[in-house]
């Protein structure tokens, strides 16, 4: 049962990793280009978490590309265990960062109306970055579950 969708060294695995990279990078760019993001810890945590996710996913995407070119099998139990731990750690960090940033964004938009009182705040970019972070997390969660499934089948 080594034919798990999203497993390392497959086209589906590579597409998951590339999607994670693209959306994590877009989330970082959206937040970093927003005025005043550095004044709020949750937004800084989101950038740090998405930056870590970008590096992790980029490294594994490169490994998938190498594996596809050389026809190497990456279904080694030790290697898959490393992928499982890395995916679950980054998934938890990304979900926590996205949730914290969503909480601050909702607070600004709906509860204290900071966005109306301080129009220089880039609330639209905060929202966009949070949405992209949740999309990134959905790809990470898919990858983490498929890695766990693959590890159980080895």
Swiss-Prot record:
Extracellular compartment segments: 39-42, 99-129
Family: Belongs to the Casparian strip membrane proteins (CASP) family.
InterPro entries: CASP_dom, CASPL-5
Glycosylation sites: 39
PANTHER family linked to this entry: CASP-LIKE PROTEIN 5B3
Biological source species: Oryza sativa subsp. japonica (Rice)
Topology versus the membrane: Multi-pass membrane protein
Swiss-Prot/TrEMBL keywords: Cell membrane, Glycoprotein, Membrane, Transmembrane, Transmembrane helix
All ranges on the Cytoplasmic side of the membrane: 1-17, 64-77, 151-154
Entry keyword annotation includes Transmembrane: yes
Protein name: CASP-like protein 5B3
Subunit structure: Homodimer and heterodimers.
Domain of life: Eukaryota
Transmembrane region(s): 18-38, 43-63, 78-98, 130-150
A cellular-component GO term for this protein: plasma membrane
Major localization listed first in the record, in broad terms: membrane
Annotated compartments: Cell membrane
């Amino acid at each position: 049962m080594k034919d798990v969708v999203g497993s390392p060294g497959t086209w589906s695995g590579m597409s998951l990793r590339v999607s994670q990279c693209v959306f994590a990078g877009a989330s970082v760019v959206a937040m970093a280009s927003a005025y005043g993001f550095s004044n709020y810890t949750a937004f800084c945590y989101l950038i740090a978490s998405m930056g870590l996710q970008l590096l992790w996913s980029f490294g594994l995407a490169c490994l998938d590309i190498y594996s596809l070119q050389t026809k190497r099998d990456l279904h080694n139990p030790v290697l898959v265990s490393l992928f499982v731990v890395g995916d679950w750690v980054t998934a938890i960090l990304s979900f926590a960062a996205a949730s914290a940033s969503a909480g601050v964004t909702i607070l600004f938009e709906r509860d204290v109306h900071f966005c109306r009182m301080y129009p220089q705040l880039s609330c639209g970019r905060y929202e966009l970055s949070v949405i992209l972070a949740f999309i990134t997390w959905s790809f990470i969660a898919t990858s983490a579950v498929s890695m766990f499934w693959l590890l159980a089948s080895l």
